Amino acid sequence: GASALAGLAITLPIGLPMTPASVAVVRARLADMQSVVPMVGLENSAIYFTLGDPLAEPDFINKILADEHHLLLDLHNLHTMAENCGFDPHAYLQRLDLTRVLEIHLAGGRISDPAWLPSQRTLRLDSHDASVPEPVWRLLAHVLPRCPNLRAGVLERMEGTVEAGDEILLREELRRARRIIQRSR
């Protein structure tokens, strides 16, 4: 969802209710898309707050994907959610059907301004405006051997966030991703 605060547009992803009705709605929408695009994937979200158990989400995703759909596993989204909701991302990955993963996304983010929340709490943001953090690189190396159907890796960076001279750092991240992927094969 998106809202405005003090003239700023703020986007905070809010998770779907993990109910059978939500599974049915998402599966129907994926089926509609699949009538146009032969291979449809669902990306895990970077949810900043959760009212339920965040480790229930992998089972919810597995039910949505079943045998027909695929997963775009965004490791920075997972890292963001794990930091903000306080859980072990490895426990999340252990529950997720990684045979459904066709793409892995890598990105970076930043920490929010403490003034955003009355509690002064900071959040990790999935802003795609920084280098891939070390925990995400470690997740990549950990998860690759368990993704037998992986077809692509995507390094994401928001347009306008690469300063002059930073292209070298971006290229190094791309080389690092390639090395990790090649080592896992």
Could you say what each language-model-derived stretch is?
Residues 13, 17-20, 81-149:
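Gly/Pro-rich active-site loop or hairpin
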Residues 1-70:
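Active-site acidic/histidine proton-transfer and metal-coordination neighborhood
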Residues 40-43, 69-73, 102-106, 151-156:
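Hydrophobic faces of well-ordered beta-strands that scaffold small-molecule active sites
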Residues 1-2, 46-48, 77-79, 108-112, ...:
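Active-site-proximal loop/turn and secondary-structure-junction residues that shape catalytic pockets
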Residues 28-40, 67-69, 139-152, 180-184:
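A structural motif corresponding to the C-terminal end of an alpha-helix
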Residues 26-34, 58-62, 93, 137-144, ...:
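Generic structural signal for well-ordered alpha-helices
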Residues 163-185:
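C-terminal helical cap(s) of enzyme catalytic domains, especially alpha/beta-barrels
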Residues 50-66, 81-94, 167:
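Distinct, well-ordered alpha-helical segments
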